């Protein structure tokens, strides 16, 4: 989750390593992800790989149905927005990892608890 520098580079590295990858972005930041369904280039130490992500979406339900492992690659100021988007959608069967952590796991857990949501495994 998150289509900025860290989110996109993490998604492409996971795709290069053979994983199925969904990239989710909040609707208010969707400008940064609207062209990401096209072929993308990952350039790493003089090697260029052409990659396609499996799913690029602004629909939280699609993203959570796609994978039980969620990597939130967003700055600290975005934790609240993503926490609210995940509320009543995420389940205890999911695993949420925050990158970078900055104790965002505590904030995410508090948001989910406040919204009476299920609490997944949360890590940083």
Language-model segments: residues:
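Charged/polar, solvent-exposed surface patches and flexible loops
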Residues: 35, 65, 110
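N-terminal glycine-rich dinucleotide-binding loop that anchors FAD/FMN and/or NAD(P) in oxidoreductases
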Residues: 37-58, 123
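NAD(P)+-binding Rossmann beta1-loop-alpha1 motif at the extreme N-terminus of oxidoreductases
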Residues: 1-45
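A generic structural signal for alpha->beta connector loops
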Residues: 18-20, 52-53, 93, 119
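Rossmann-like NAD(P)-binding element
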Residues: 49-97
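Rossmann-like NAD(P)(H) cofactor-binding subdomain of soluble oxidoreductases
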Residues: 76-124
């Amino acid at each position: 989750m998150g289509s900025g520098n860290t989110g996109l580079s993490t998604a492409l590295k996971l795709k290069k390593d053979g994983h199925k990858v969904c990239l989710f972005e909040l609707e208010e930041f969707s400008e940064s992800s609207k062209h990401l369904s096209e072929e993308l280039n990952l350039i790493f130490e003089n090697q260029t790989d052409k990659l396609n992500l499996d799913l690029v979406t602004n629909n939280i339900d699609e993203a959570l149905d796609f994978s039980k492992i969620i990597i939130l690659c967003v700055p600290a100021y975005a934790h609240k927005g993503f926490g609210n988007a995940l509320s009543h959608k995420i389940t205890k069967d999911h695993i949420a990892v925050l990158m970078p952590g900055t104790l965002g796991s505590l904030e995410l857990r508090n948001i989910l608890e406040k919204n009476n949501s299920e609490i997944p495994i949360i890590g940083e």
